[in-house]
Amino acid sequence: AIWNGLGLAAWLVDADTLDTGAELSDAEKARRERTRQSGLSGIIQYQWSPDGKALLFPLGGKLFLYTLDAPANEAVRELPVSGEFIDARISPQGRYVAYVQGQNLHVIDLRSGKSRALTEDGGGVIHNGEAEFVAQEEMDRERGYWWAPDDSYIAFERYDETHVPVIKRMEVYPDRTEVIEQRYPAAGKNNVAIKLGLVSPADGNMRWIDLGEETDVYLARVDWLPDSKHLSYQLEQRNQQQLDLKRVDVASLEQQTLLTERSNTWINLSSDLRFLDDGSFIWASERSGYLHLYRYDRDGTLTHPISKGNWNIDKLLGVDATNGRVYVQSNHDYVPDTQVYALALDGSSASAPQRISKEDGTHTATFAEDASFYLDTFSHPETPPQVSLRKADGSLIQWIERN
């Protein structure tokens, strides 16, 4: 079903009419366990197209595209994917759908309706377009490929498990127990060998980014810059005491180290990196003993802290570069609470964030891409979860679920 903005819901697809009841692959089972979706069935995930006119969703081992303004008998389109697949996603411009099948990266051209493999060496110990076990389990990185904003390239991870030891683990079911062999990089043992590639969805042209001579490292994060001409990646040493942020020129593959984060203990990874249109960026760091945000210019020179003091940022929620505002989640005012705050991008309010959320309790916010409004889920020991749509200043636009 879909909420139409007027407080009403419209039924789109009946999962029972499409679901074949196909058995999930081991990879998909593992993904659902990590996202706490293992006990669910039917349509459990979906993605909007960039123009908001279509929905992509997997169901019963098949992949479907639902077009909202199409006639009822033409609205649901089954895409040409045969067999088990994972991680299907629409490209930012809506031209393609990428997915991983047989440990290879594939792409569907939605104009022609044709599907083809972008990599062909996957299988066995070789994986393309997937995040390795450690990345998924310990680094909060489930993705193994990343679309350029203009659809020109896909950056993807290729990893080789050849030298990773094999262990045995048990899977216990109500009627049986199964022994599963799995490659597991225990402490002191070999890790996977990682490569970072760039491939064109249009012609399959592929190139590789030089990750350096040190091979016992983690590919922690990959992010495209808004111009689609540059890619960034974060490389962490295995002892987790050094993290490098690098920027790659896509045309020449020349690289620049923008910053290096070091710690005598370990570095907590963050997903709060944001590149702005001018090439400058926002970086999250615990260097002060608290997690705060810092503004860097395009060459990696620190210009100023965006937040500071004896309090933590929990999460970067959104950036409104036009109006110079940054929105974060924090417990700045009262430790048991989770609230939404606004900070000035120029650092002028670094020590005094402005609270946006109204009620005391727990607020979980999802901001629009331009940070002009957000979806707020609020709860309190005496109040069940309430969902509302709000302007960036916290004022109410519409209740979704007043509860």
Each PLM stretch: what is its role?
Residues 1-385, 389-390:
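Beta-propeller folds
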Residues 399-403:
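N-terminal cap/lid segment of alpha/beta-hydrolase-fold proteins
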